Amino acid sequence: MSVELWQQCVELLRDELPAQQFNTWIRPLQVEAEGDELRVYAPNRFVLDWVNEKYLGRLLELLGENGSGIAPALSLLIGSRRSSAPRAAPNAPVSAAMAASLAQTHAQPAAAPVMAVADPVSVPTAEPAQASDMAEASSRDSYDSMADSAPAPVAPGRTEQRNVQVEGALKHTSYLNRTFTFETFVEGKSNQLARAAAWQVADNPKHGYNPLFLYGGVGLGKTHLMHAVGNHLLKKNPNAKVVYLHSERFVADMVKALQLNAINEFKRFYRSVDALLIDDIQFFARKERSQEEFFHTFNALLEGGQQVILTSDRYPKEIEGLEERLKSRFGWGLTVAVEPPELETRVAILMKKADQAKVELPHDAAFFIAQRIRSNVRELEGALKRVIAHSHFMGRDITIELIRESLKDLLALQDKLVSVDNIQRTVAEYYKIKISDLLSKRRSRSVARPRQVAMALSKELTNHSLPEIGDMFGGRDHTTVLHACRKINELKESDADIREDYKNLLRTLTT
């Protein structure tokens, strides 16, 4: 049987499978012909067992249909066709007689997404997965559901994988997005400290902050900075073993390792990296077995001087369901918040993205978008893409009028959600006072400070003038509103409580 027939059948299977599944489980396979027998090599037992269970039946069917019609002789082994002594799997050789039963499981293959690479990978599940609500489980069915609910968040063609040979057949694949670098990161007041800390780690790993813990809301640049560190480490040392993954993938890998009685291989993989970058660590909450394993992995890495970088959507002490010993260890290094970008940074982000897309974006147009899209960078970029597409399809230059047309539904929703009435109601609920208190003449600190916060938010989030805002706060003068805004801006610099309150309210009102 020829290798060409195998390649032909693999191409047919590519058309039947989602790209993520094909790239994860089929692409890593290597094949060589030995007489009438095909020897198929999987990089490790993870891949071998999964291919055997989920895809082998269909592969044998395709080989039979496109070959001579005779059941092919096929052996599954662990190793590489270039290795001198591959290790035979206990279930090899496999004949077509097994195809019927194996093909039954083909209808529901597991999706462990990964971008395509030319060379095989050894641990295919160590990649970023979308933050889905996957429960820790020990049964095969629970792992299937876990894998099926993890689509890749990285756009096709955006991920560069780098394979580094380590002990035995084990390889490390970084799964870093090559476009996320320090050069493409837009620095502003809201992320200045986080960017500086990330650069310090990238330029001086193991001797800087370890672990580095970045936290903040969705779409603020935490993942970008994490990838930037990884890319810089690999730029300095292409042989560095840098691995990025989502926390749910760590859970999925651990469950799979337990099922395959391969926990030692799992430990060896994660404890042999030079830098481990784990996104959205809050998904370890209430997963006791995963926390236990990560606790020991974390300790082993720090004791070995290897770099650890973590991200979360909240301050580590606020992650409910996370063991105190983990929270304590996360504080051993440096914990930095990534705040929502201020207006100037949002404008700079839009201008940089437009420049990268080779699109002319007038400054007043960027300012218009930035004023109205405030929640996070991801939504900001999404709005810009819509504007660019509208401009391209309509054959018109980007103007404020065109922006109003292309973002009509989004702007209407923003205007509906962010009104002075809504701000007053949200602030009153947050500080546990009555709306009537905000409109009253009371000057006690418990009322005056929330009133000033509400006025400052109204100025930032709405298009009302100062006199209009003052009128909606019990008929106050515009100078009162101006004083409130200046006072809150000063307190955000000096008072951590006010800064946190304002950030929380801003997130609530704009998300």
From Swiss-Prot:
Per the UniProt entry, what is one GO biological process? regulation of DNA replication
Query: What is the species listed in this Swiss-Prot or TrEMBL entry?
Result: Pseudomonas putida (strain W619)
Q: What is known of its domains?
A: Domain I is involved in oligomerization and binding regulators, domain II is flexibile and of varying length in different bacteria, domain III forms the AAA+ region, while domain IV binds dsDNA.
**UniProt-annotated location(s):** Cytoplasm
Name this protein carries in UniProt? Chromosomal replication initiator protein DnaA
Assembly mode: Oligomerizes as a right-handed, spiral filament on DNA at oriC.
Which residues of this UniProt protein bind ATP?
G219, G221, K222, T223
Q: Where is this region: Domain III, AAA+ region?
A: 175-391
Residue ranges, annotated region (Domain IV, binds dsDNA):
392-511
